[in-house]
Amino acid sequence: MQNLTNLSSRTYDQHFPKLSAEQLAENAKKKVIVGMSGGVDSSVSAFILQQQGYQVEGLFMKNWEEDDDTDYCTAAADLADAQAVADKLGMKLHKINFAAEYWDNVFEHFLAEYKAGRTPNPDILCNKEIKFKAFLEYAAEDLGADYIATGHYVRRRGDDENARLLRGLDSNKDQSYFLYTLSHKQVGQSLFPVGDIEKPIVRAIAEDLGLITAKKKDSTGICFIGERKFKDFLARFLPAQPGEIRTVDGKVIGRHDGLMYYTLGQRKGLGIGGIKGMDENPFYVAEKDLVNNVLIVAQGHDNSALLSSGLIARQLHWVDRQPIRENLRCTVKTRYRQTDIPCEIQPIDDETIRVIFDEPQIAVTPGQSAVFYQGEVCLGGGVIETQIK
């Protein structure tokens, strides 16, 4: 059912090179399964691949079984949008339920990390376990795919056997931070059609085509939480243990609702302020004392208690799968959309690294990922174990 429509896009023609007949013929031998989320990025990705001559089919993944509050998880609406786009593009849409895999390999880890006082990033684990493992294996083994494709804003360079992962061209939308666990082999089996263009161009192509997703709002947050309050959601699965809020000097200034609800560097939602004998500078979460169930806060954004000179990271993944065994100069992000931090990686062993920043950094958070770059290339990363003060 490849490209049975006569759809065209002037915006596409302006931003993508015209392929030779030989290249189109070569691509026509390859089958690509696009992960269709019901959003604009995957919709346009499918169209781009059709224009490049590939045999294109879509696959919609359901990764969460809705609870009784179906307003929060929009799987049914997203499926309807994905189907409408598939119909418009004249391509087949497969459906698969990965909810069991998601629960076992992503959600249970998410809960365990929060229970241990860390702040995990389930999007990274979802990409690792679902989109580039369960989906990739299903597409290759059951659907006969040569490649999968997603709407991620990243780029790949090099041949299939030695593919490198690069930042997306649109620096505001770059998602390489979430894909650092991929191996060069997985990158080589994947295509990222929108990684070489900017988001406004993606929307313009969708507008040209009259796609139902053209003006659809980007999804925010995690499907299983959606737009609901995070605290209410987490309380359904983990019992909260309220406790004291203390300053770094040990003064009790309030009560917290449970350490799992707070993250390092957090300012809002602490419920403290205007304390007698203290200045008006806001408080920030500096530390979580798990042993005593105490939330430790520091006053002022530039308070030294909030700063780290480096970090220790484990659970390492390098895109080329070669461990780093010598000190390496590069840059690092310790959270999404952060400006790159110049640093040095100092390997401790193949499973552990020490990272020293050129300048102290605020809110380095255990459980989050440290992702490393040299220029445009994403080297890989690891999970932050501890700060180095």
UniProtKB/Swiss-Prot annotation:
Site (Interaction with tRNA) residue list: H152, Q368
GO cellular component annotations of the record: cytoplasm
Region annotation (Interaction with target base in tRNA) ranges: 121-123
Gene3D superfamilies given in the database record: Adenine nucleotide alpha hydrolases-like domains, HUPs, Translation factors
Catalytic activity: S-sulfanyl-L-cysteinyl-[protein] + uridine(34) in tRNA + AH2 + ATP = 2-thiouridine(34) in tRNA + L-cysteinyl-[protein] + A + AMP + diphosphate + H(+)
Binding sites annotated in the UniProt record for ATP: G35, M36, S37, G38, G39, V40, D41, S42, M61, G151
Superkingdom as given in the UniProt entry: Bacteria
One GO term (biological process): tRNA wobble position uridine thiolation
Keywords for the protein's UniProt record, in alphabetical order: ATP-binding, Cytoplasm, Disulfide bond, Nucleotide-binding, RNA-binding, Transferase, tRNA processing, tRNA-binding
Protein localization: Cytoplasm
Active-site residue numbers: C126, C223
Region described as Interaction with tRNA: 173-175, 335-336
SUPFAM superfamilies: Adenine nucleotide alpha hydrolases-like (SSF52402)
EC number: 2.8.1.13
Enzyme class: transferase
Disulfide bonds: C126-C223
HAMAP family in the record: tRNA_thiouridyl_MnmA (MF_00144)
PANTHER family found in the cross-reference section: MITOCHONDRIAL TRNA-SPECIFIC 2-THIOURIDYLASE 1, TRNA 5-METHYLAMINOMETHYL-2-THIOURIDYLATE -METHYLTRANSFERASE
Function: Catalyzes the 2-thiolation of uridine at the wobble position (U34) of tRNA, leading to the formation of s(2)U34.
Protein name: tRNA-specific 2-thiouridylase MnmA
Protein encoded by which gene: mnmA
